[in-house]
Regions:
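A generic local secondary-structure boundary/capping motif
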Residues: 26-28, 110-113, 134-135
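Short, low-complexity, glycine-enriched hydrophobic/amphipathic alpha-helices that associate
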Residues: 56-102
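Extended, charge-rich low-complexity interaction segments
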Residues: 64-76, 173-210
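Membrane-engaging insertion elements
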Residues: 87-126
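Amphipathic, membrane-inserting segments
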Residues: 114-176
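Short cationic amphipathic helices and targeting signals
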Residues: 4-11, 120-126
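Charged, alpha-helix-enriched surfaces in structured cytosolic catalytic cores
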Residues: 14-18, 59-63, 82, 106, ...
């Protein structure tokens, strides 16, 4: 049994909603257990959770937000996701119908690059003995499936969080340097104005002596 994170990227948004509706009624089997799932869409560069379900909870649809899936969604929608995916993302058309098992450092980058504006995806936390079961579920639609061991995905998340902190630190340092330069220029401007004012005063006094 392997615990996996599965990202199913859809070419057609309506199919993503249909698939998620069917997924919420998913009949659990030993060979493919689904714990949590969230449907996300990308609009104007923002990652928006549209629907979610948690088979491990009696209520609280948002229970996924504090776990691995929530972290993945947050990172994909954050500065690291933007850096990994570029400005527009890449169309998934040529990859439709494929299922890719990814190694370390690959899930976030691949998902970010394939999520372009207007696209949708379903992210699942599953335990699988037979990966073909969920592949078959999603390949009824025009999808690309990305799969990664959940532990490896968690390691990616932790690395991305550290990277985000470093990006924030560097941005803050750059901002402080910019403000320091602006304040220095402002002070210099005041000094020059003071020098000009003093010179003018003494020039007037000198003129009276002529």
């Amino acid at each position: 049994m392997k615990q996996n994170i599965i990202v199913a990227l859809f070419n057609i948004s309506s199919e993503a909603y249909q698939a998620f509706s069917e997924l919420k009624a998913y009949s659990q089997i030993t060979d493919a257990l689904v714990a949590q799932a969230v449907l996300i869409k990308k609009e104007n560069g923002l990652i928006i959770p549209a629907e979610s379900t948690d088979f491990t909870a009696n209520t609280a649809e948002s229970a996924w937000t504090g776990g691995l899936i929530g972290s993945l969604v947050g990172i994909l929608g954050g500065p690291i996701g933007v850096l990994l995916g570029g400005a527009t993302g890449a169309l998934i058309g040529s990859d439709v119908g494929t299922a890719q098992t990814l190694g370390e450092g690959a899930l976030l980058e691949n998902a970010a690059k394939k999520l372009d504006n207007g696209s949708t995806a379903i992210i699942i936390l599953a335990q699988e003995l037979n990966e073909a079961i969920l592949d078959a579920f999603f390949h009824r639609f025009k999808t690309v499936i990305l799969r990664q061991d959940a532990v490896v995905a968690q390691q990616e998340v932790l690395a991305a969080i550290e990277a985000e902190k470093e990006v924030a630190r560097q941005a803050h340092e750059a901002w402080k340097k910019q403000r320091k330069a602006e304040r220095k220029a402002e002070r210099q401007g005041k000094v020059e104005a003071f020098k000009a004012d003093i010179k003018q005063k003494f020039d007037k006094l000198a003129a009276k002596l002529k």
